[in-house]
Amino acid sequence: MHARQGMTRRGFLRGAACGIAAGLMPWGTARAETAPTRLALTHGNGRAANVYDALKLIEPQVREGLARKKTVVIKPNMVSVNQQLAATHAECIEGILEFLSPLVKDDILIAESPANGPAHEGYDNYDYRRLAKPYRVRFVDLDAEPFQTEYLVNERHHVRPVRFSSLVLDPDVYLISAAVMKTHDRAVVTLGLKNIAAGALLKDGGFRWGAGSRGKTDKHLIHGGPENQGIHYNMFMLARRAPPHLTVLDGFEGMEHNGPTEGTPVDHRVAVAGTDWLAVDRVGAELMGFDYRKIGYLSFAADAGLGETDLDRIEVLGERIADHVRAYRPHDTIERQYLWM
């Protein structure tokens, strides 16, 4: 019974993704006419410096994107408000702000909806508040902001309404995903896209993990069922709705084994940045030693032409990928996570 359900789920997910891909992807010679995708990879002994240097390498692409938007929003990853290894470090945000300072004249919003508690606790615990002195920033709790209704699937492929941040979906926003390179217990890895797709799903203001919590959260609905039957399809669909315009992966200290909250540190000292979210996440997975084709949502997005995944067509500025690949230990449930294939 379990195997038959798995086959049905795989058929549904692959069929749906390929059907969408047929409508999105300009298959054929049009692909060959595009210029290679550029992204940056840096390595060094300073987290903020790594991020800043990576962004400087792709400054023309970032400037081009900023010129078309009114507001800049940095979305950190705070799956936990009280565990630094699981969250975007303030020094990563500092590197981004230092780069943006001469390019953006208005306040830059730092906006988050942590999984296990209120945003203000994360901002306090991780010392984000100090960034308000040298930079023009404003801190936003996405759970207190307007939302729009999006739809995800559950394990029976029925749609479920969810609250999704209106700020993240705002067409006038230049959205930056500032993520940590981590393994994951359901989606293999956490990188730039997952930070947006899961992080912009909202919860009630009083919600916390654990017994006695007040309110509800919509974040778990991205899993698509108790065995994560729809997680990759849901991530893929949200990638079409809210792709980041700029992705920054902070791998100065990554997380391996039982991420995204119970893993152990990896002294990697890298940063990746680019305006093609799929190319950045694909390179991030490569640096962590994972085959992106085994990561469902990245595979679906590649089939749909949502970005570049061919390393021969990705121009990496700065360091060479091959020089910095580390074999991150995967989550204990990794084989079960690969059952979508």
Show which residues each predicted segment covers:
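N-terminal and secondary-structure boundary signal
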Residues: 2-341
